[in-house]
UniProtKB/Swiss-Prot annotation:
This is UDP-N-acetylglucosamine--N-acetylmuramyl-(pentapeptide) pyrophosphoryl-undecaprenol N-acetylglucosamine transferase. The gene is murG. It comes from Shewanella sp. (strain ANA-3). GO terms for biological process: carbohydrate metabolic process; cell division; cell wall organization; lipid glycosylation; peptidoglycan biosynthetic process; regulation of cell shape. Pathway: Cell wall biogenesis; peptidoglycan biosynthesis. Cell wall formation. Catalyzes the transfer of a GlcNAc subunit on undecaprenyl-pyrophosphoryl-MurNAc-pentapeptide (lipid intermediate I) to form undecaprenyl-pyrophosphoryl-MurNAc-(pentapeptide)GlcNAc (lipid intermediate II). GO terms for cellular component: plasma membrane. The keyword Transferase applies. It is a peripheral membrane protein. Transmembrane segments: none annotated. Its EC number is 2.4.1.227. It catalyses: di-trans,octa-cis-undecaprenyl diphospho-N-acetyl-alpha-D-muramoyl-L-alanyl-D-glutamyl-meso-2,6-diaminopimeloyl-D-alanyl-D-alanine + UDP-N-acetyl-alpha-D-glucosamine = di-trans,octa-cis-undecaprenyl diphospho-[N-acetyl-alpha-D-glucosaminyl-(1->4)]-N-acetyl-alpha-D-muramoyl-L-alanyl-D-glutamyl-meso-2,6-diaminopimeloyl-D-alanyl-D-alanine + UDP + H(+). Belongs to the glycosyltransferase 28 family. MurG subfamily. Pfam families: Glyco_tran_28_C, Glyco_transf_28. One of its GO terms (molecular function) is undecaprenyldiphospho-muramoylpentapeptide beta-N-acetylglucosaminyltransferase activity.
Amino acid sequence: MTDAGKRILVMAGGTGGHVFPALAVAKYLAQQGWQVRWLGTADRMEARLVPQYGFDIDFIDIKGVRGNGLVRKLAAPFKVVRSILQAKAVIAEFKPDVVLGMGGFASGPGGVAAKLAGVPLVLHEQNAIPGMTNKLLSRIANQVLCAFKNTFTQVKAKVVGNPIRRELIALGAEPKQAADDALKVLVVGGSLGAKVFNDLMPEVVAALSKQQSITVWHQVGKDNLTGVKSAYQQQGQEGGVNVAEFIDDMEAAYRWADVVLCRAGALTVSELAAVGLPSILVPYPHAVDDHQTRNAQVLVEAGAAFLLPQAILDVNKLVSKLQLLANDRAELAQMGQRARDVAVLDATEQVAQVCIALAEKG
């Protein structure tokens, strides 16, 4: 189906969990002949990332207010009104047929501006607990979409999964490689790393290696490379460990791994399901409304992951879980299959089709 000449304004920013699913939808619609424009903020990751994918981006001046000081909260209403007017000007100039909000600071003013301009508004919530912006906008949106069931309680929402890259969906369909003797553990802590993983894993590997052959690919985050490498060396474990500040090729990392130790961001959970990998999930304890714990439950309840809250995490618990998986490769394989079984593989197409249908209705 082609829709040459149709226009969409995509609103997403702040974190990869918002931006990457939105990019998947934007790329899909661009391939259908749509014109795509982005609305974001100049000081967050979308300002750098979106132009790299070939999309034009407009900026509005807006910041979050949750947990900020009194002065900022008092000034917030005036700044919100200004940002709505800025978004309305973008809409008036671009004339989109539909507006898609996928989270981040710009989505709030942009969503209100879309409603004021009479442009159909579609929302997509990636997390199991909706963010404040989507919770408010859900009452005025034409269509509310979500990745997980029971996300919204006050409005009717359609469960469509999280849009992810096609390469990862294809990876999940590949035949699994025969397991080596060594358990291959991928440790991912996000762009800044996870201090708890960086602190514990050198000791975990040292303890495990006395009983079990293990190799580790550990993404430690910005400015943590030297310290974590040194910690592995002090434990005599530098030989079987690949320590990296960032992992640019997550497809290669997922293909390599037998099991993943990571946080439970919405995109991470959806990617683990799509590629069919078992995991040990340690939700970020300071996430708003503890939404990462709810995200994790999707895989935990399917029998595809173990949940270890950070408050109780220690070397012994990690050693115990990894030893269990190393000793039972059949269970490891079954956990991976259970992960794949709960994956929603056509989320990108579902979100795009909702946008297409609303644009055609006018």
